[in-house]
């Protein structure tokens, strides 16, 4: 299966401009099975407009994502500000299948309070879905700093993590190392989609979108575009046979 992470600048609060950019990049980089969009790809962290976007733009954006997935016959995932069933605002990653049907929703568990996410409701569960033989789970940005979340999911035999982010350039070393570590320690693939460019507050973003595997980074970039590659279950199996860390885990020790 070929998976690609879209890496793009985001115009904060400009939904239509961001949607057009996604269309352009999907057109330019056709041929993959699965595409992943950055965290809050339609709005950025323009918090003053989040409520308006959640109520007036997100429903149409979800329909548009569904239509794009069906039209292009791809799996398409990314995160948006929206409301949950209780009416609370959440940072939600959604994925649509090749027929445009909603497959899964994941609400960000670890909220990044310094960026104003405190008024959002944190997620309570990470669902695992299966696509073409690959078991897939999800993370959003700050989640990467919490290895126990990824390990608990990996123990349920996850083959691919999809992680979206708006990770700043000043901490790009941490991003690359954390993405690689989550893939290496859990002997799986991790597809990362991060933002590039600057936001309306002049914050620069790190890029590094791409594919990370059980032996480390496979491909990543700091440029606009789509980055990833072919993933193979046989390669994962081979890596897990060389170093069988799951069978050799020692539990019950009082460290």
Question: Regions from the language model: what does each represent?
Answer:
Residues 17-27, 145-151:
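Short, acidic/polar
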Residues 6, 53, 106, 129, ...:
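Hydrophobic residues at beta-strand termini and immediately following loops
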Residues 33-34, 136, 160:
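Structural motif
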Residues 57-77, 145-228:
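CN hydrolase (nitrilase-like) catalytic-core segments centered on the catalytic cysteine
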Residues 15, 23-98, 105, 168-184, ...:
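Cys-nucleophile CN-hydrolase/nitrilase-fold catalytic domain and related Cys-dependent amidase chemistry
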Residues 7-13:
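Short polar catalytic/cofactor-binding loops
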Residues 84-156, 170-177, 237-255:
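Active-site catalytic loop in hydrolytic enzyme cores
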Residues 1-5:
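Extreme N-terminal starter segment of soluble prokaryotic enzymes
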């Amino acid at each position: 299966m070929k998976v690609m992470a879209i890496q793009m600048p985001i115009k904060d609060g400009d939904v239509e401009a961001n949607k057009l950019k996604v269309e352009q990049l999907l057109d330019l980089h056709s041929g993959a099975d699965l595409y992943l969009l950055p965290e809050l790809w339609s709005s950025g962290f323009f918090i003053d407009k989040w409520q308006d976007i959640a109520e007036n733009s997100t429903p149409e954006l979800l329909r548009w994502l569904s239509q794009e997935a069906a039209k292009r016959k791809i799996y398409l995932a990314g995160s948006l500000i929206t409301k949950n069933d209780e009416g609370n605002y959440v940072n939600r990653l959604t994925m649509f299948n090749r027929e445009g049907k909603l497959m899964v929703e994941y609400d960000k568990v670890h909220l990044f309070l310094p960026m104003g996410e405190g008024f959002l409701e944190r997620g309570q569960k990470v669902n695992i879905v299966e696509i073409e033989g690959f078991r897939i789970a999800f993370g959003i940005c700050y989640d990467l700093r919490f290895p126990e979340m990824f390990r608990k999911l990996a123990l349920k035999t996850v083959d691919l993590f999809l992680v979206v982010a708006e990770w700043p350039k000043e901490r790009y070393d941490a991003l690359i190392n954390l993405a690689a570590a989550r893939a290496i320690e859990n002997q799986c693939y991790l597809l990362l989609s991060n933002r590039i460019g600057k936001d309306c507050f002049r914050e620069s973003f790190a890029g590094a979108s791409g594919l990370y595997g059980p032996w480390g980074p496979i491909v990543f970039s700091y440029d606009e575009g789509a980055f990833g590659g072919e993933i193979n279950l046989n390669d994962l199996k081979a890596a897990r046979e060389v170093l069988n860390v799951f069978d050799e885990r020692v539990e019950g020790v009082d460290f």
